[in-house]
Amino acid sequence: MAPAPAPAGSADQFRGQARLPRFAAPRRYELRLRPDLDACVFTGDASVVVDVSAPTRFLVLNAADLAVDRASIRFQGLAPTEVSLFEDDEILVLEFDGELPLGEGVLAMDFNGTLNDQMRGFYRSKYEYKGETKNMAVTQFEAVDARRCFPCWDEPAFKAKFKLTLEVPSELVALSNMPVACETIAGPIKTIHYEESPLMSTYLVAIVVGLFDYVEGVTSEGNKVRVYTQVGKSSQGKFALDIGVKSLNFYKDYFDTPYPLPKLDMVAIPDFAAGAMENYGLVTYREVSLLFDEQSSSASFKQNVAITVAHELAHQWFGNLVTMEWWTHLWLNEGFATWMSHLSVDSFFPQWNIWTQFLDSTTSALKLDSQAESHPIEVEIHHASEVDEIFDAISYDKGASVIRMLQSYLGAERFQKALTSYIKKYAYSNAKTEDLWAVLEEVSGEPVKDLMTTWTKQQGYPVISVKLKGHDLELEQDQFLLNGTSGAGIWIVPITLGCCSHDKQKRLLLKHKHDNIKAIVSQCDSRQKGGNFWIKLNIDETGFYRVKYDDELTAALRNALQAKKLSLMDEIGIVDDAHALSIACKQTLSSLLHLLYAFRDEADYSVLSHINSVTSSVAKISIDATPDLAGDIKQLFIKLLLPPAKKLGWDPKDGESHLNAMLRPMLLVALVQLGHDKTINEGFRRFQIFFDDRNTSLLTPDTRKAAYLSVMHNVSSTNRSGYDALLKVYRKSAEGEEKLRVLGTLSSCQDKDIVLESLNLIFTDEVRNQDAYRVLGGVIIEARETAWSWLKENWDRISEAFSGSSLISDFIRSIVTLFTSKEKEAEISQFFATRTKPGYERTLKQSLERVLINARWIEGIRGEAKLAQTVHELLHKP
């Protein structure tokens, strides 16, 4: 039977709604919070100026995991007649005797809660101080967890001003979004009053209380910037401080809008679920995303700190000053911050070739968006629990990639001018995706909305098939799906085309399924024989689509590759497209191997990084698809990657480039994983020296992962000395990066007992919940059954320990995607049939689809008659 409709006028009418009603909105919050870090609880009181704009007897706001003192609730002196807390909906409904007066009134209430250990809401994080374990109090409110700290209108569109007061132990540092206005000390407790904030959304309110050191800088406008670290680690904050100051200066100039707050603090938090969080004026980070130590940090971690800081500070404009109206438009926050971070870091470190590395983001988005279980950039959100799952490669990486495509189409100058207008128009308020398109259209005069709606409102992207017919070029678009089916989508595609030259470009908009470019051959230099004629679509991979060439054009491109006629970005695009077409069984694995072989003299970090991803993927699938050939395929890839690895060696060279410093460990790790004996033996030798002398120059931070994997290569239950040595390194290391490095290798082993021991570390105090993904990510194909059995046996425990956190998705994704058969997909589906929750439902569906995609790819590979011949031919080629 269907449930009866809620009686008119009852609190039940507000249940099951995606959003809060609009008849009342907060204008200003006065909050006082008293965290008790020993008892891990907090008390608080709120006084909220509420504007009632339509006749109502109700006030409806969000609250969750809080005890609200019902007797304390008053609105303009009136006590509610009914107080209903609906836990599933996370709403608090206050019902009054008569209609509330229109206009502004004050809602007051007291409440209390627990400083939880779930890394959301108002929570506790453990740290060591002088040999003692202490708690700090931290907030993490995005997306929907401010309601776990204080009752509020917890939606981005309800912007209000915030005036915070904290009562904390006198010896502690207490930070919030705004600077301290005044402070009074009464014995062991100090009361800190903060300045009132400008209009802002609840998810950006932040508090951090603990013991900290800091380093300080100042922007060109005089804004004070600080990086707070655990006591004794402040020198590790200097690099992030430098990037922070430079980023604020860069964005101020780019948007022609000053940083809106008087100060910016960045704080390293030991327990932190995300990589970082852009709270207005008080940005919080995982330690490894903020701290950099010249002695113990690798080049890739240094780059990660720069990109992460630049990303979070871009949010101070795109997200905080101008905020998305609802979570459907999350991509406006994350896509733009991702794109802007590359723009700014490229200006700080042009030698890093960061835009070439940006293609990692595009590849990641193309991979997810070629699944039927992907979602549009603009995704409908019906329940708070669904929001966490869209903080994914679509919102971040596809968002950033289509922004890059649009900037390329409009031109950098027009694009910047439009963004500046947009920021100024919507400052201190909210915007939807359409609002951005309207400003871009107004400034550029181009049909931006029609073009971009095809990319943000529909899921997926096209593959453009290119055929040479006489002197003409035929183009056809189809939705690209890895499962081999074809969707019905049609996109307006900004096509760029290079003919025999990177510089001679043709541009057009492909608006229909088919198009013809007439006399393309005569427009290029005359069609020469001898391999000089070639055509490349999607120059520098600025477009978010794949390209499939006919045989003649494919051969010509391979020649152009070998003759080094293409840009690095174009080389990457060709490799990634060929890999995806192979997985989708639209091209043979043999043709992919021939293409990879054309890169045998490659030396560039970004290109080799993508080749390494492809060789790793093919090596793994070959274990199941062609077990007899798997060894030879690995040898072929060793042949490909060994020359650049030999050239770089294990030891860094004086004055070498940042990119070579990142290339060395990537190649060494790849060779170890492919089973190259010499590399494994050398890694093991260097580890033994390092284990006895941590200061040896023979194992730098960059090359340690390769050495650790070399150690694990020979570990078993009967030969566990290497494993125990790595555990000792883990336990003795004070640096977060070093701990992560070891964690990522401990489960990289075929031995069942060792794998289980490593996975069970997740349940101990030795591994912080935020780092569990590292252990999971290390599991190799040969140990997948062990890991799957462990996941099933421990699912209830995992669900409890990681509930309410996006981290639970890591368990599913890491283990499920190791499988490649329809039978296994059915078994896993059956297990989760009664265990799925909205917080990880999308991840589970995507992971299961990936299993079926792999199963189909295996069938395709097994059907290739000439694969063995190709492998042996390439393997024995001089």
UniProtKB/Swiss-Prot annotation:
Cofactor binding: number and manner: Binds 1 zinc ion per subunit.
GO molecular function: alanyl aminopeptidase activity; metalloaminopeptidase activity; peptide binding; zinc ion binding
Alphabetically ordered keywords of this record: Aminopeptidase, Cytoplasm, Endoplasmic reticulum, Hydrolase, Membrane, Metal-binding, Metalloprotease, Microsome, Protease, Zinc
InterPro entries: Aminopeptidase_N-like_N, Aminopeptidase_N-like_N_sf, ERAP1-like_C_dom, M1_APN-typ, Peptidase_M1, Peptidase_M1_aminopeptidases, Peptidase_M1_dom, Peptidase_M4/M1_CTD_sf
UniProt-annotated binding residues for Zn(2+): H311, H315, E334
CDD domains referenced in this protein's UniProt entry, alphabetically: M1_APN-Q_like (cd09601)
Tagged with keyword Protease: yes
Membrane topology (UniProt): Peripheral membrane protein
Free-text domain note: Dileucine motif seems to be involved in protein-protein interactions.
Name this protein carries in UniProt: Aminopeptidase M1-C
Source organism per UniProt: Oryza sativa subsp. japonica (Rice)
